[in-house]
From Swiss-Prot:
The chain crosses the membrane at residues 5-25, 51-71, 77-97, 117-137, 147-167, 176-196, 203-223, 227-248, 302-322. PANTHER family: PHOSPHO-N-ACETYLMURAMOYL-PENTAPEPTIDE-TRANSFERASE, PHOSPHO-N-ACETYLMURAMOYL-PENTAPEPTIDE-TRANSFERASE HOMOLOG. One of its GO terms (biological process) is regulation of cell shape. It is a multi-pass membrane protein. It is found in: Cell membrane. One of its GO terms (cellular component) is plasma membrane. This is Phospho-N-acetylmuramoyl-pentapeptide-transferase. The gene is mraY. Its main location: membrane. The keyword Glycosyltransferase does not apply. HAMAP family: MraY. Its cofactor is Mg(2+).
Amino acid sequence: MLEQVILFTIIMGFLISVLLSPIFIPFLRRLKFGQSIREEGPQSHQKKSGTPTMGGIMIIFSITITTIVMINKFSEISPEMFLLLFVTLGYGLLGFLDDYIKVAMKRNLGLTSKQKLIGQIVIAVIFYAVFHYYQFATTIRIPGTDVSFDLGWAYFILVVFMLVGGSNAVNLTDGLDGLLSGTAAIAFGAFAILAWNQSQYDVAIFSVAVAGAVLGFLVFNAHPAKVFMGDTGSLALGGAIVAIAILTKLEILLVIIGGVFVVETLSVILQVISFKTTGKRIFKMSPLHHHYELVGWSEWRVVVTFWTAGLLLAVLGIYIEVWL
């Protein structure tokens, strides 16, 4: 029965995204919600200017409807499900405001860094407040073992850091057609397996709902992309995957399963540090996916390579937790 629920969930998430996209994409185009391309980015990206953005709305809609329908039919809204939906919708709303300012108000930078950071922290603090209210464990466990450590009040700092950092890391990965959609689908699929292994079936249902929604979106986001998810989608996905890691006590394993997001972020950090300290850049451009573009790789080759890396890291993460 539960296996059928999981199958129905991913199919439903996929179909909602696929069927909604042909309606929603022309609507975004009529509103002239087109992506502006930075001049300092790769020149090959300039032809993408005007491609409809804010497609993350479709992903979030699919996730929300699919999750609520499946949970109401086969279970009930648990505290875990509430937290997952809250983070997804909260970070999605923050991303929506950022995108709206960019495309509707023609302010290419969107929200200021300070405004976005404050929003991310506020959502993370509310998440932890609810988390604490329901007395979820403040322990952190070493993957593949029963060894855990209670961080006490320090867990609050970890949660806020993970949600803010994780949402930004996923956001940085959304730079090529289909790159984030593919890597996210893989990562959420891995967490679905691990949540299922822990008998956290509501978290598993949510995870496959996200995977299905993102795969449906990928049909229209793969190269050449007909729509971008924007910060609306990337921040929502980032917050969601971190929340899943926290609720399944797989915070450490997130670094492996989400390894592509981690490496992308580290490439930006190292680039900034190197330039400020030595005046030289380590990469031709950061995040890392742009570096490979500028050394001559085709966009599709970069994307498939990163998908492959994400898949291998996901398999490694599952192996460590389940079979090691």
